[in-house]
């Protein structure tokens, strides 16, 4: 299960383009396949604002990256777990009841994510 990208969008280790973030995730999938592991790609969770990076507006970048991931998963016949569509609010962020800081899921959110994942794996 590959759920990655939000820390790169937040530029936690410096700037990285969406294309390079996507390329890194593709590399993870290729490594998994090399070792006979079937990748399961997950969308990046919704986030309107990063609490530690108020100069970055991630919502649109997350949507764009998720579209790239969804298309890649479809092309390669990988399972795609769309957390974003199921969890986003009207601002493309996590609803307040699912997070303390707008970024990290809380226990209630993880329960919902579990069900979304199990449903996708059926």
Question: PLM features: what roles do these ranges have?
Answer:
Residues 1-122:
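Alpha-helical cap/lid subdomain in secreted, periplasmic
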């Amino acid at each position: 299960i590959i759920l990655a990208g939000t820390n790169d969008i937040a530029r936690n280790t410096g700037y990285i383009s969406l294309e390079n973030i996507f390329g890194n995730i593709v590399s993870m999938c290729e490594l998994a396949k090399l070792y006979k592991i079937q990748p399961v790609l997950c969308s990046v969770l919704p986030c309107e604002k990063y609490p530690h990076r108020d100069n970055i507006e991630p919502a649109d970048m997350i949507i764009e990256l998720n579209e790239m991931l969804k298309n890649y998963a479809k092309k390669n016949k990988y399972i795609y777990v769309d957390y974003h569509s199921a969890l986003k609010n009207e601002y493309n962020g996590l609803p307040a009841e699912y997070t303390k800081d707008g970024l990290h899921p809380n226990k209630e959110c993880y329960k919902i994510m579990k069900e979304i994942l199990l449903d996708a794996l059926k």
